[in-house]
């Protein structure tokens, strides 16, 4: 699941700039939204790597802040051959923010869901006898 769409990228960076970036990456030299969609998919997977530490994925609702961060990462990926200092700095800020989300220092606005714990009284329990050999046994051999 992508956290942003091509329309989100266009709204943030303009359609003209997006077309200029996607044109050289196609065989016929025409702008192609598939290139932008691939960058958004890669950015979403990158973000999932950080979110998976605290949240159950996929998210049911994507907050606007996460949508923005996805656009920033995708824009960096689209500019991979010649990123400007501003694009690189914004990308690094996004990575720092994702690290803070992963570590629990920042709230991304996502509903905190944990994995469902099993419910019921007939749960499996495993018991075993104490170990036969241990380091405390001396003079055995």
Curated annotation (Swiss-Prot):
Keyword RNA-binding assigned to the entry: answer is: no
Which segments carry the region annotation Disordered? 102-141
Induction (record text): Expressed in the late phase of the viral replicative cycle. Expression of late genes is activated by the viral late transcription activator C.
Organism of origin is Escherichia phage Mu
The knockout outcome noted for this protein's gene is: Accumulation of unattached tails and full heads.
| Any one of the GO CC terms | host cell cytoplasm
What protein am I looking at? Gene product J
The subcellular location is:
Host cytoplasm
Q: Which UniProt keywords apply?
A: Host cytoplasm, Late protein
Under Pfam families, the record lists: Phage_Mu_Gp36
- InterPro entries hit by this protein: Phage_Mu_GpJ (IPR009752)
- Principal place of residence: host cell
């Amino acid at each position: 699941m992508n956290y942003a769409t091509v329309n989100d990228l266009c709204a943030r960076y303009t359609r003209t700039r997006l077309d200029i970036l996607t044109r050289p990456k196609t065989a016929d030299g025409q702008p192609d939204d598939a290139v932008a969609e691939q960058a958004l998919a890669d950015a979403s997977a990158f973000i999932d790597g950080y979110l998976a530490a605290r949240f159950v994925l996929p998210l049911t609702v994507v907050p606007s802040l996460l949508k923005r961060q996805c656009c920033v990462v995708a824009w960096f990926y689209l500019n991979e051959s010649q990123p400007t200092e501003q694009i690189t700095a914004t990308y690094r800020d996004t990575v720092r923010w994702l690290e803070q989300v992963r570590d629990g220092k920042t709230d991304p606005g996502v509903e905190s869901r944990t994995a469902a714990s099993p419910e019921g009284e007939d749960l499996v329990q495993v018991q075993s006898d104490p170990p036969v050999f241990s380091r405390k046994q001396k003079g055995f051999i």
